[in-house]
Each structure stands twice: as C-alpha cells, then as structure tokens.
Amino acid sequence: MKTCWKIPVFFFVCSFLEPWASAAVKRRPRFPVNSNSNGGNELCPKIRIGQDDLPGFDLISQFQVDKAASRRAIQRVVGSATLQVAYKLGNNVDFRIPTRNLYPSGLPEEYSFLTTFRMTGSTLKKNWNIWQIQDSSGKEQVGIKINGQTQSVVFSYKGLDGSLQTAAFSNLSSLFDSQWHKIMIGVERSSATLFVDCNRIESLPIKPRGPIDIDGFAVLGKLADNPQVSVPFELQWMLIHCDPLRPRRETCHELPARITPSQTTDERGPPGEQGPPGPPGPPGVPGIDGIDGDRGPKGPPGPPGPAGEPGKPGAPGKPGTPGADGLTGPDGSPGSIGSKGQKGEPGVPGSRGFPGRGIPGPPGPPGTAGLPGELGRVGPVGDPGRRGPPGPPGPPGPRGTIGFHDGDPLCPNACPPGRSGYPGLPGMRGHKGAKGEIGEPGRQGHKGEEGDQGELGEVGAQGPPGAQGLRGITGIVGDKGEKGARGLDGEPGPQGLPGAPGDQGQRGPPGEAGPKGDRGAEGARGIPGLPGPKGDTGLPGVDGRDGIPGMPGTKGEPGKPGPPGDAGLQGLPGVPGIPGAKGVAGEKGSTGAPGKPGQMGNSGKPGQQGPPGEVGPRGPQGLPGSRGELGPVGSPGLPGKLGSLGSPGLPGLPGPPGLPGMKGDRGVVGEPGPKGEQGASGEEGEAGERGELGDIGLPGPKGSAGNPGEPGLRGPEGSRGLPGVEGPRGPPGPRGVQGEQGATGLPGVQGPPGRAPTDQHIKQVCMRVIQEHFAEMAASLKRPDSGATGLPGRPGPPGPPGPPGENGFPGQMGIRGLPGIKGPPGALGLRGPKGDLGEKGERGPPGRGPNGLPGAIGLPGDPGPASYGRNGRDGERGPPGVAGIPGVPGPPGPPGLPGFCEPASCTMQAGQRAFNKGPDP
C-alpha cells in the first residue's frame, strides 16, 4: 500500500509530458535530397564540424507517402501516441523510386537507418524488406530485412567484390508482438550496431562496401522472396542520417510505456470503500481526427490556380485544321520546268505555301469557312480613305409634321431651315445591312512578335490547384484520372516569324466540313461598304442598349413649374443604377439642410434595363417634301450670336463617347413630379448577371417532426470494451444463517515447501518464549527435597483452555482446493474511461430499404478569396423576360448640345422616335 500513491502520480506526470514529447517527435525533419555543404553533389558532407549539424533524409517525404495518403491511396492512422500520425501501407500500393533521384552519388560510407513501425497480422511471420535498394536488374544491393520466421533483423550490403554480404541480429522475439517498435542501425566503417526501442542489442563486424548501382530503384515494404509483392504494415517514421552514432543519442519518448508484471500475484481483495472525490485532472490531450464526413455539396469554382509545370511531350496529335493564310513572302525566282513524272499516290495535304508567281488559275469552288483567328493587336491608324461616290437616292421619307416659323402657322410654300436643335436621344438599333463589297486592302500592319511553339498532345487530367512548391521527385505512376474541366483561354501568342517558302504541294482532295467553331473574338472594324439595296421592312427590333453618354450640354434656362399632379402610389424602390459620368460643375446652389452622416454603402449591382417610356402623341401627317440634290460642303461660317432657345431638333445621330465631366456639387432635392401615365408593357429584358453571394439568412422556423424512419439493420458487433474501474466497497451485508456442517474435505496434495524463516525471526520468537516461561524454567532448576518416590497419580481433569498462542511459523503451502461454488454477481462497477478510437472498419454491405429523406440544406460556405478572372465569352441571348413593373419617372435630363442633321435624313418625320426606343404601338 505504500507504493500505491506512486501510480496516480506517475500517470499524472506522464499525462503532462506525453504531449510535449510526442509533439517533439511528431515534427519530422524534411531535408533536401542532396546536401551541398561541401560544394559537391554528395549525400553527406565529408567535413563533419559537429554531429548534430549533419543532415538527415526523411524517406516518408522522399517516397511521397504523405501525398499518397492525401489522395486516399493509403490510410492515415493514429501512430504510437495520440498525437502521432502513421500510414497504413497495404499490399495494393507500390512505393518505388529511381535510386538516381534519391542518391545520385550513391550511399555514403557511414550513415544510420532509423524507423518506427508496427507489424500486424500475417506480417509477423513473413520475411520481408522494410527498405531496400535494387540494381538495374532488380537484385538487392542494400537493405534492412525483418525475418519473422527466425525472429531476426538482417542488414545486407554489397561488398567490394560485388557479392551480397549480410549481418544478422537474432533472438529478437520481443520485436514480433504487434506493438510499435523503433529499430535503428548505425553503419560505421567496420561495424554495424542494432538498437531496438533505444536498447543496444549487438554490434557486428562488416566488410568494406562497394559502390551501388544508381540505375535501379529504392523500394519500401517488399517480400524478400518476391520483391514485386508488397507487405502490409504501419509506418510512422523512417530516416537516413549521415551520423552513424545518431542511434546512441536517440530517445523513444513516442513509444508507449510497457508495464512489466509483478513477481507474485495475490488473490483479488474485496472492493474498498469509496474514497473522497479527487482533484480535477489535467486537461486532456487533443483527440484524434474524426472519421471522414459525408461528401459535401459542390463548392463554387475556385480561383485559377498558378500555372503548372510544363508537362511531358504528349503523343502526336491528330492533324489539325488548315490554318489561316500566312503572310505574303518575297517572290521566288522561277524554277526550270521539269519533266512530267508519273502520277503518284495522293499525299498528305501539306501546309499552305506562300503564293508563287504562277499564271492565275480559274476561280476555284468556294471553300469551307476557316476557323476564326485570334484577335490581333490593334494596328496604327491608317490614312484617311478617299471620298466615296455619292450614294443612290434614298426612299421617300415619311410625311413630316407641320412646321412653324417664329410662331407663324404653316408656311405658304416652304419654311426656311430652323436653328440647329439639341441632339436627340440615341436611335434604336438598325437592321443588319447587306454585306458590302470588299473594300480596298488596308496598309500592311506591323510585324508581330514570335509566338511560342505549342505542343500537340492529348488533353491531360486537370490536377487540383496546389501551392507553387519546389520541383519534387518523380512520383509513382498513378491511374489515369478523369477528364478535367476546360481550362481558361490562354493569352494570344504573338505573331510568329514567316517561315521559309515551302515546296508547292499537290492539290489535296477537299476536306470534310469541320465542326462549328467557337465564336471568334470581335474583329477590327472594316472599311464601310457601299450602300446596299433597300431591304424589306423588317420586324420591330428589340430595345437597343443605352447609348454612350453625350457631351455635357450647356446650361438651359429654368422651366416654368408645372401644376402639381395627383399624389401617386408609392413605387417600388428601384435597383441602384450604374454611377453616371462626371457632370460639369453646376452653379452653387442654396445651402441645404445638413443631412445625417450615412455609412459607406456597398457598391450597387448593375441596374436592370428599365421599361420603355411613354408613347408620345402622333403628330399630323405632313406634306412630302421634294428631295434636293446633295450640295457641296460649304466653308464654315463665322460664329453667330447666341440665339434664343429653339424648338427641339430632329433626332441626332449618336455622338462619340464624351469625356467624363467633373463631379458636380450636391444639388437641392427637387419637388416630386407629377404622376405619369401608365406606360406600355415593355419587352422582357435580358437576364442580368449573377449576383454576389448573399449573407447567411436567419434560421428558419422549426419544422414539423418527420415520419419515423424504418428501423435500420443491426450493426456489426462492437469490440469488447475495456474492463471498468474497480467499484467502491459495498456496505456489509446481514449475517447469514449458519449453514450445515459440510463434509470433510479430501486431504490436500503435498504443497510446495513454505518460505524458510529468517534468523532474525527465529531470534524474536525465542526471546518471546523465554520471557513468558522464565519463572517456570527457574523453578525447575531448584533442587527438590529428597523423599520417597510416590506412585503416579491419576490423570487430572483437563485444564481450562490456555490463552491463544502466537502465530507459528508459516506452514507449507497446501494443494489448491476444489473450485468453490459460483458466488453471486458483484455490484455494478463504475463506468470505465472512454476507450481509444478503434481502427476504421471495412466498408459494410450496402443497406436495404428505401432512401431516406434528404437532409436540410446547409448554410452557405464562407466566400472564397477575391480574384479577378478573365472576362468570359458572351453568352447566348436568353429568352424574353417577364415585363417589369414600370419604374418611377426620373427627373428631366439636362439640355443637350445643339444637334446637327445630315441632308440625307432631313426629311425624316420629326419626333417619330424622339422619346420612344421601342417599336411603334
């Protein structure tokens, strides 16, 4: 009992030390494959300043075991401690790396091999290599062999004569017990020393070693008799260190403590009384990783990953489609006419050669449309083209409205031209004109830069975007992955230099029509073609997009306030529009009431296209005017005086994009305008862009309880739990009724001799006997009076029972008695501690029964990192949308600049589409 207090203290201290010791061991060193400490390309440096400065090489990283675990090729398990990570290598994986990638200059003369691993199942009885280096023909050169048949560890190496030498360490039964073990072998110049669990086992002499063949492979976990077969085991740590004495300084804190059994075993005592509650225990160590959860929903597309390393040259691709015409090369010298040869087999269509100086041939049949080329760089501004001939007379325009002149009614003959009006609103998009004739060839653009030569290969599987790391070693050959998603379009490469003129190839057969290509980039604006013939009146087009804002107009005179209209219904709040261009600085307004400081709002989304405006009244039909001939352009006249505000002019053509004006001062809030009439239903607008991810919504109300599901199948039987903690001692039970006297038991078998009493014990017993019977002994020593010898008396009655004597010497142990009757079950013990998480079981059989109801929709994930992707291709036009609710009429816009009118369009009906961008009603 004196040592019982040491046990909880021992575990209390260990619970604090274990995380620190485990954490120190868990961080495996990751060193480069080659050390360049001495300027050479050797594995270990020749100059050894200090043993602790020598490098080590983590074989788990070199064999990419951890990466294979992330790809689920192998299983990641708990190691020798709760904080350790290990890898369960099965017999279906092959860890094999070219030796040249790991040890380009071979192994050093002195080094040490260290590993922490565990064998389970049938591996305990197998003869296998935990690490081995093979030559180019597959023969062993260096290796560490674990032989479960002879319970030994064998270090094999290649001698100077090329023969395989071995150093066998035997009698290692403690290594084959399904527990975690740590073996280390220090290879010195003339000896090899084995350490098992940081205990030195033996040092064996070894012969000088020859160089290894680096054209072979380094492997992990292979059978000794068949190196192609893998052996299942669990690997936590494997290291090659340049210090051969490293095993002497290594510790084994990561290994679990092994409790040795006691020499004697007593019978189990009765349960003790319940003690007082103990002090609160220390914080528990972090738990191990939980089991993998269900597959989550597909996340949003991630940002484009960094450019991967160039792949290996792919297999030759299929013949590509004919490329675009190349640049015109210099004229070659005419060759001599050769003799006519025999007709050969049709050859493979050659690449398009440069035009020669042959006689023009007859026009060929129209060819198939080529693939659209990549958008070239914008060339320099060309010289102005020559003035084109006047176009044919246009069709008669619609009848104009009755004009006014200085307030007079209709002019008797013809009204003089009025002042130039303000530019009208942009007109609706016109119908597509007929294809114009080919214009004059433009000037040759500048020579483009040379493009990179692309490699033709099959489409490879797109890997997950990883961090840009150092170039790793060649990994194991994996299975061919699924076809990845289409990558982003690359930047167009620069124009390549013209190649040498090719030989004139034979005319190949016309090729089959290729598939429809993707929509090409918008080309440069061509030279305007000649006016085409008048086309039939087309259907009304869809609403055109808003035009580019015009130049800021001059400040107009304030209009007269209109009569107040009836109070309209409260309109729906409009979508925040796109910020307008910067206006010109307005006049300083009156100081308004100071508003409350508002918070900075988020950027608004692009507004949707509003409904068309109200249809204005149709004017009276005017008389058709006679069309005059187009006169020459007159010289610009002198600037006239500023006239009075004229009547609105004819709709002007869209002006060039204006420069953004200065930001104007905050204007005074105007009075609400009169209620407008109900506008016509507009056509459905184009689908807007996808909005940003909204904030997480509030949790919804609790749903009603679902129907109880069908009972599931009975699960597999769980593993037996750990024995519970010994329960408290129960209260003494009532005294039982005296039982009947049992039958005399059989004599026991002669037991083993008891323990011999010590000399000290004998002295104590003798002293106690002498003290108790000293008076009787002294009386017996007196000389008695001499007398006649009397007759022996009758035996007296039995005296009273004497006092209980002292404990005698321990007797010899008797034979073991017959087993007693099974006693009643004991009291229920306290709940035992939670056991360690067991290994992940095999996948069970598929369940039966109908599928369950789908789970609740999870909350949206956190927004991904901000990135700026490239603009995607224009999408197809969507179906017409539902007409939106008419918006609140906006405030009147500022007056525009004075408009202008081309003579060819002066006869258009004034105001026909001045304020209506939609079709006629």
From Swiss-Prot:
Residues 24-268 are annotated as: Nonhelical region (NC4). Residues 269-405 are annotated as: Triple-helical region (COL3). Residues 1-23 form the signal peptide. Residues 273-285, 298-307, 387-398, 794-804, 888-897 have a biased composition (Pro residues). Residues 269-324, 325-356, 358-403, 416-472, 473-516, 587-643, 655-712, 713-755, 790-847, 848-899 form the Collagen-like domain. It is linked to Multiple epiphyseal dysplasia 6: A generalized skeletal dysplasia associated with significant morbidity. Joint pain, joint deformity, waddling gait, and short stature are the main clinical signs and symptoms. Radiological examination of the skeleton shows delayed, irregular mineralization of the epiphyseal ossification centers and of the centers of the carpal and tarsal bones. Multiple epiphyseal dysplasia is broadly categorized into the more severe Fairbank and the milder Ribbing types. This is Collagen alpha-1(IX) chain. Covalently linked to the telopeptides of type II collagen by lysine-derived cross-links. Residues 50-244 form the Laminin G-like domain. Residues 479-489, 833-845 have a biased composition (Basic and acidic residues). Residues 418-756 are annotated as: Triple-helical region (COL2). Residues 368-383, 602-621, 630-650 have a biased composition (Low complexity). Glycans are attached at N171. Keywords: Collagen, Deafness, Disease variant, Disulfide bond, Extracellular matrix, Glycoprotein, Hydroxylation, Metal-binding, Repeat, Secreted, Signal, Stickler syndrome, Zinc. It is found in: Secreted, Extracellular space, Extracellular matrix. Structural component of hyaline cartilage and vitreous of the eye. The gene is COL9A1. The lineage of its organism: Eukaryota, Metazoa, Chordata, Craniata, Vertebrata. It comes from Homo sapiens (Human). Residues 406-417 are annotated as: Nonhelical region (NC3).
